[in-house]
């Protein structure tokens, strides 16, 4: 499967890009409440005022992270649509995005992390997180409908599929093995294929 640019590793040369890359990795491993600007400052050897210049608040940084993640997922979904024949395989390849995320150092979905922290998030960040999941539901529902899932079931089926992928990432982290047979990526792909077969 194609390797998609989701995780922001060395994605740009500007200071803002480097800050976003660092923050994304921190969120995906520690959670929104598990990092501070001091962590980014130490990793990138830049001052905290420099970070505040680009992202005045942690909430502003989080919104920028989610906006970039939404855009990258949109590009990846289009590539799945363009590269893959048939709805079943498109759903399996879409799950590969989640497996790829985990393969990058045991990370989990950026917006899945934000969802876990939802009660402590600023309202704007919660809304941005909701918008990300709305994008995913819309696409998955469209593929399921194309596969012939009845309209009365499409919404619930899309929710179930997304919930399974997000949960599979947590199980993969519990396994603690990004690579190798039986490791995290295999867990994610197995969950996806099993659920796709059940839904279609």
Where are these regions (language model features)?
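N-terminal intrinsically disordered/low-complexity leader segments
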Residues: 1-14
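Hydrophobic alpha-helical connector segments
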Residues: 64, 68, 77-107, 157-161
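Amphipathic alpha-helical packing segments from all-alpha helical-bundle domains
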Residues: 74, 89-93, 104-108, 122-147, ...
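Helix-loop "lid/cap" segments that line or gate small-molecule binding pockets
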Residues: 80, 97-102, 110-120, 143-146
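Helix-turn-helix
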Residues: 18, 22-60, 64
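Hydrophobic alpha-helical segments that form the core
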Residues: 108-113, 151-174, 183-195
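Short amphipathic alpha-helical interaction patches enriched in hydrophobic/aromatic residues
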Residues: 77-81, 122, 144, 148, ...
């Amino acid at each position: 499967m194609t390797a998609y640019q989701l995780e922001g590793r060395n994605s740009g040369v500007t200071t803002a890009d480097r800050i976003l890359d660092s923050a994304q990795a921190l969120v995906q491993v520690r959670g929104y409440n598990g990092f501070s600007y001091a962590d980014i400052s130490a990793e990138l050897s830049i001052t905290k005022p420099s970070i505040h210049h680009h992202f005045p608040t942690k909430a502003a940084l989080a919104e920028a992270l989610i906006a970039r993640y939404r855009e990258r997922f949109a590009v990846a979904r289009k590539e799945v649509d363009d590269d893959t024949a048939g709805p079943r395989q498109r759903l399996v390849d879409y799950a590969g995005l989640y497996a790829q995320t985990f393969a990058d150092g045991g990370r989990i979905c950026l917006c899945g992390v934000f969802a876990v922290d939802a009660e402590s998030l600023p309202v704007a960040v919660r809304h941005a997180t909701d918008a990300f999941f709305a994008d995913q539901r819309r696409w998955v529902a469209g593929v399921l409908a194309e596969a012939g899932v009845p309209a009365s079931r499409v919404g619930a089926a899309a929710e179930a599929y997304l919930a399974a992928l997000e949960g599979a990432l947590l199980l993969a982290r519990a396994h603690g093995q990004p690579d190798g047979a039986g490791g995290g990526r295999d867990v994610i792909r197995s969950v996806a294929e099993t659920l796709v077969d059940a839904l279609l």
